[in-house]
Amino acid sequence: MLREERRAAEEAITLIRPATSRLVDPDIRDEFGLETLDMNMGPQHPAMHGLLRLILELDGETIVRCDPVMGYLHRCQEKIAENRTYPAVIPLTDRLDYFANMHNEHGYCLAVEDLLGVEIPPRAEYIRVLMCELMRIASHLPSIGFLLLELGAFTPILYAFRERERIQNFFEAVTGARMMFHYIRIGGVKADLPPDIPEKIWEYVEGLEKRIKPDFIDLIEGNEIFIERTRGISRLTQEEAIELGLTGPPLRCTGVAFDVRRDYPYSVYPELDFEVVTDTAGDVEASYRVRIKEVYESIKIIRQCLEKMPEGEVMGDVGRRVRPPEGEGFGRVEGPRGEFAVHVVSDGSDTPYRVHYRDPSFVNMQLLQEKMPGHYLPDIMPIMGLVDPVSGGWDK
């Protein structure tokens, strides 16, 4: 009871007093000649989610300013696409957010298909959604595991990568690759599912649904250290999240029920029953709850895909040489980190005139500059876990 009362008091104080009140009073600073400290964190740092550099200004252990510096993994992806044929761009998208390869391929193919006006076979649409939801699980669970690992807990990351490994085995059986799939193609998918895979996936999600509570929820939510390190950290309001253009779990953890799958439906999502998971706290703990509940929703979607998937072809009427008419195509999907959108401009040739990617990791990184100040230095890792950026996404 005392612990709950203490927590309630701390939350009340946090609501009344902004985090910046931890800073040393300016009068005291002038009297004693105190100075802030500039410190670099990264780009080579095991907890930076990739090649990211944070320039920090510290007042003791309190963050005064945080400037993210990106570009260490920039590969000119959009420019390279201008010199590739339309199908040859698909392998490049796998190298963007490498924890959401299927979603990247799907978003790009939707944009080109928008230009072509091609009809996708129903079976291919269900296979696309099936693969993307497996990919979402294979991203969310490691994200949770990484968050706990950065807080000092080792066991959840082992359970998370056990599940990711099993899903990658399915990907390998279907696509021939474990990460860079090149599976979703313009007009459909590369190949049909092997005959034994649907039953194996069904058995897997049945077992996963039973394992989530003991292996993740019970292990994490009863951990006092996790609660102390995540509750109230980087608390976002709905207005702040919308103003920053956040999408995905960082937005939905504030209570904004925006999901591209429902609000701008694509593929066969309108035919599937699922809930848009939200929370109201807007902090790191809330983002964890959103991700773990979305795993349950992905399991629900996977079951429906396996039940409703019709027989038939898996590729539409698209020639080997793709040459869309002049114009612009747009595709958007709901990736694990938020809205992934692709804008393709065609000049009538077999190579794109312009390709632009809107990756959620890049947009959501704005949160660091806005919400880091006022928090303590050790809070950087939980806040990074809220954003869950991937360097292949923010650097294209």
Swiss-Prot record:
It is a peripheral membrane protein. It is found in: Cell membrane. NDH-1 is composed of 14 different subunits. Subunits NuoB, C, D, E, F, and G constitute the peripheral sector of the complex. InterPro entries: NADH_Q_OxRdtase_suD, NDH1_su_D/H, NiFe-Hase_large. It catalyses: a quinone + NADH + 5 H(+)(in) = a quinol + NAD(+) + 4 H(+)(out). Keywords: Cell membrane, Membrane, NAD, Quinone, Translocase, Transport. This is NADH-quinone oxidoreductase subunit D. It is an enzyme of class 7 (translocase). GO terms for molecular function: NAD binding; NADH:ubiquinone reductase (non-electrogenic) activity; quinone binding. NDH-1 shuttles electrons from NADH, via FMN and iron-sulfur (Fe-S) centers, to quinones in the respiratory chain. The immediate electron acceptor for the enzyme in this species is believed to be a menaquinone. Couples the redox reaction to proton translocation (for every two electrons transferred, four hydrogen ions are translocated across the cytoplasmic membrane), and thus conserves the redox energy in a proton gradient. Its main location: membrane. The lineage of its organism: Bacteria, Bacillati, Actinomycetota, Rubrobacteria, Rubrobacterales. It holds the Pfam family Complex1_49kDa. Gene3D superfamilies: Cytochrome-c3 Hydrogenase, chain B. One of its GO terms (cellular component) is plasma membrane. Its EC number is 7.1.1.-. HAMAP family: NDH1_NuoD. Belongs to the complex I 49 kDa subunit family.
